Amino acid sequence: MSGKQDVPTEVQQAKPLVPQWTLEDFMSEKPYAYLYAYKDKKFLLQQMLNRAQAQAKALKFSGFMRMWNSYVEANSPKQTILGDYQTMFPEQPLQLRSGHYNCDEFGVSYTGRMGESVTVCSHPIMPVMRVVNLDSKEEKMQIAFRRGSKQKEWSTPIISKDVLASSQKIISLARQGVAVNSENAKDLVSYLTDMESMNYDEIPTQNSTGHLGWLPDGQFSPYCEGVVYDGDNPEFKRIFDGFRETGSESVWMGIAKATRSGKSVPARLALAASFAAPLVSILNALPFFVHIWGTQGCGKTVGLMLAASVWGNPEVGKYIKTFGGTKVSQELYASFCGNVPIILDELQIMADRKSFDDIIYMLCEGVSKGRGAKDGGLQLQRHWSSTIITSAEMPIVQSNSGGGAAVRTIEVNYGGEPLFEDSRTVAETLKQNYGFAGRKFIESLKDPETLQALRDIQKRYYSQLSGEIQDKQVLAASILLAADKLADAALFHDGKALTVEEIKPYLITRDQADVNVRAYNWLCGYIAGNPRRFDANEENPGEVWGVIESGICYFNRTFFDRVMHAEAFSPSSFLTWADRNGKIIREYYGKNSGNNRMTVRKKVGGAKVACVALLLPTDDDKAPVPVMMTPVQDDDMPF
């Protein structure tokens, strides 16, 4: 055996098989017909093409490849005319014209221009439905495919058209089981595009949505005909599919009625907040929080499960989420919920309590943050209009929370009282029985007279609650009361709707909502809790922040700013409020002086320093007068 590597026979044959052609030959059919005769010997043909092209280049003829391609196209097998072939997939969802594509149990293929069989996809695949989103008007395509003889059901994902139109993006379908890679991606794109074009009128069109709740045509997802879910998030798809009637309606109704007639107002408020969710947009309100908190082991999570079971699967981790996600994930969840309650459990898992306000403001805005799109412009902003029902072992509104956060939240502290007599049994029962009340409640809203009665009763509750209670709190509470009243009329018929007297203890007044009022109360308590910091006695080894004389705390401005910033209060905002409300004494140099300060000069620790002169409460200060209310009489109600 020689040491030289054997040269393939086809390579040895290529050189002698290519004649010497002239420039005139290249302008005729002669060389192209000669080469085309070797079309079935692909490797040899490529060798011959390379040598022929070299000859043409030597003769300064630059059109060789264009002439070759034209000759091949003119002499390749004629494509089947449009509509000659039809899809012949076993048990196919529908039959479509396939043009020159051969569509059978072995997949999709076509005849190439050299007469060869080209595989587009190794298994059956076809477009079956055009999907148009009711909100964005974006079109998607539902494709159907199945692989292997053991797969009886067709997989039918809904895919964005920009994915199906791109050979780079369509490869992502491999994650869903489609046999696509970089080799056949381009052919698969062409096939799906051609199939839609050939069968545009035959492929049915379906309306779709990517969220729960009210749709532009007045229907309510998922309780609507002719609308499918087209979202890309598989987790949201599972939640959407969980919005169905499961188990026994009478069993669920028994738990709900027992809760409504029970002693736990917090549990009843959670249920009312669930029914209130689709009413927020109807009554032209913004989203608001109902936060249930107290010691562990009293059934607060089961209260959330009861609220969730009105609509769908109440298991924690499915419809009910936790506060552990990012702000973006919470935005996505809120926009998916749309007009059903946004339910979040376990606030305490968040490490940074100062971000509580951010969550409240973000979710109560009802619109996602504006963000740039990858291809330029802005992303489509998402919207929601609902109630946000949350739970924790602590309040969500802190002493230093902004007034906007406080008024957007109804905080329900159940103390140590259990919400249910047997929380474990209630939880297990709800997991097996859910989804009945939501559909019936929405059906009741289709009656124009019911809608008008709803608006009337909400206005009456608003009027009865108005007074010292902050306006946003009044609006939220009136919606909760109206929702519970409507649920009683449409579902329960037990006369156990919440009353003004029952909800009022959880509402806050205008003064309680004012962050500066809360800052003043906190400061007074902080000063009282740190007496040594205001004692200039030489025996005091620690820091001296000021002195207290005649009911006035002279607080060194440096230390004052430090403690205020530590609690996330604004010193300048507070001092402006305190000056306007007579809570401080300050130096005054005249109306037109630019030297007016919010401080006074006071000797502390042997040196005169700028101090905030804060007037402390005295024994004569009166407690806030309770808000007086006129009870709403059932006889006056439209339900």
Regions found by a protein language model. Name each.
Residues 346, 385-395, 413-415:
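A short beta-strand-to-loop transition that corresponds to the Sensor-1 phosphate-sensing loop
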Residues 41-46, 50, 70-87, 203-204, ...:
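DNA transaction DNA-binding modules
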Residues 373-390, 405:
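AAA+/SF3 P-loop NTPase mechanochemical coupling elements
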Residues 357-372:
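Conserved catalytic/switch belt of AAA+ P-loop NTPases
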Residues 227-316:
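P-loop NTPase catalytic core of nucleic-acid-dependent motor ATPases
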Residues 3-16, 27, 33-265, 332-333, ...:
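Conserved glycine-centered beta->alpha loop in an early N-terminal alpha/beta scaffold
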Residues 302-355:
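AAA+/P-loop NTPase substrate/partner-engagement loops
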Residues 382-384, 400-494:
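Phosphate-sensing "switch" segment of ASCE/P-loop ATPases
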